Amino acid sequence: MKKERRQKSFHRGVRAEKWAAWWLRFKWFHIAEIRFKTKCGEIDLIARRGNLVLIVEVKARSTLAEAMAAVSRMNERRIEAAADIWLARQKDRALLDVRFDLIAILPWRLPQHIPAFFTSDK
């Protein structure tokens, strides 16, 4: 039962990430990475448009408030650490503007994109 619930949650997350990636493509962003994993943490989506880089956390929840509350300070730190690793691999990193966004996937609604959902302490 627990394994089934975990698998269902995983697949719901994958579908949400695909929907969020589609939404960003619709806004003319290039999807640079999906599910970028490091030993420090994972980034759901990394998108680029010119020098703007979006580090995106995707949450599938019933309400926008639930999606926003699902991102803890610890999650933010892990995302920042993973973003540092990704950025270190970019040749043009000195030119990049980085933003940490949230995309909430809600039932029967278009994705809710929250730009600059949190800022880096660095």
Curated annotation (Swiss-Prot):
Superkingdom is Bacteria
Q: Which InterPro entries match?
A: Restrct_endonuc-II-like (IPR011335), tRNA_endonuc-like_dom_sf (IPR011856), UPF0102_YraN-like (IPR003509)
Listed transmembrane segments: none
Q: Which SUPFAM superfamilies match?
A: Restriction endonuclease-like (SSF52980)
Q: Which GO terms describe its molecular function?
A: nucleic acid binding
Residues spanning the signal sequence: none
- Give the record's family classification: Belongs to the UPF0102 family.
Protein name in UniProt: UPF0102 protein BQ09720
- Annotated organism of origin: Bartonella quintana (strain Toulouse)
Q: What is the lineage of its organism?
A: Bacteria, Pseudomonadati, Pseudomonadota, Alphaproteobacteria, Hyphomicrobiales
